Curated annotation (Swiss-Prot):
GO terms for cellular component: membrane. The chain crosses the membrane at residues 41-61. Disulfide bonds: none annotated. GO terms for biological process: defense response to other organism. Belongs to the LEA type 2 family. It is a single-pass membrane protein. It comes from the Eukaryota. This is Late embryogenesis abundant protein At1g64065. The keyword Membrane applies. It is found in: Membrane. The keyword Membrane applies.
């Protein structure tokens, strides 16, 4: 019997089309959700940030400070002084330029107030009225021509006056208390601003020097 030659053929590879490979089944993965704990942390963080911003804004807009009042300049006129050791005297007219600065976010409305001039520690030698008015937010109002008539006739004790007259200087102090209210975002607050300015009246030169306001 003649042996038959057997040839084993490798299996033929079948290649599919490229479009068939790409159109294979797609695997859909379910989107993972954030744990409930993280959402709670995010919410609390946002609340804390909003609360902090509210505190910062309230501290800026709702903070109410005292308006600043000061004497910018003072001039003199009709100055007279003299007498003797038993009857010394002085008389003068002071004309002041006063400013009131309101640094708040609300208007400042103040009532009529009194400006007093004090001679050293001996007492009041003159006073006048400052009419009330309105100072808008972040504005400065200048009150010009505030006239005060001063004189030693108001003093009960003229001790040391003769010595000061001979030296040619009088130590004076102007004091004013301004009371008013400030309205910010519906809130009304009463504030009292106090002015205290020291100065020296030069009798020889007939002018004010060393003006300093606290």
């Amino acid at each position: 019997m003649v042996d038959e030659d057997r040839i084993t053929l490798a299996p033929t590879e079948i290649y599919g089309r490229s479009d068939e490979e790409q159109s294979g089944p797609r695997i859909w993965r379910r989107k993972t959700e954030e744990p409930p704990g993280k959402c709670l942390v995010y919410s609390l963080t946002i609340i804390v940030i909003i609360f902090a911003l509210c505190l910062i804004l309230s501290s800026i807009f709702l903070r109410i400070s005292k308006p600043e009042i000061e004497t910018r300049s003072i001039s003199t006129r009709d100055l007279r002084s003299g007498g003797n050791s038993t009857n010394p005297y002085f008389n003068a007219t002071l004309v002041s330029d006063i400013s009131i600065r309101n640094s708040n976010f609300g208007a400042f409305e103040f009532e009529d107030s009194t400006l007093r001039v004090v001679y050293a520690d001996h007492g009041v030698v003159g006073e006048t009225k400052i009419e009330g008015r309105r100072v808008e937010a972040h504005k400065t109002v200048r009150i010009t021509g505030v006239v005060v008539e001063i004189g030693s006739f108001r003093l009960l004790d003229t001790k040391d006056l003769d010595k000061d007259l001979r030296l040619g200087f009088l130590e004076l102090r102007s004091v004013a208390e301004v009371r008013g209210r400030i309205k910010v975002l519906g809130r009304k607050r009463w504030k009292v601003s106090v002015m205290s300015c020291t100065m020296r009246l030069n009798l020889t030169g007939r002018f004010i020097q060393n003006l300093l306001c606290e």
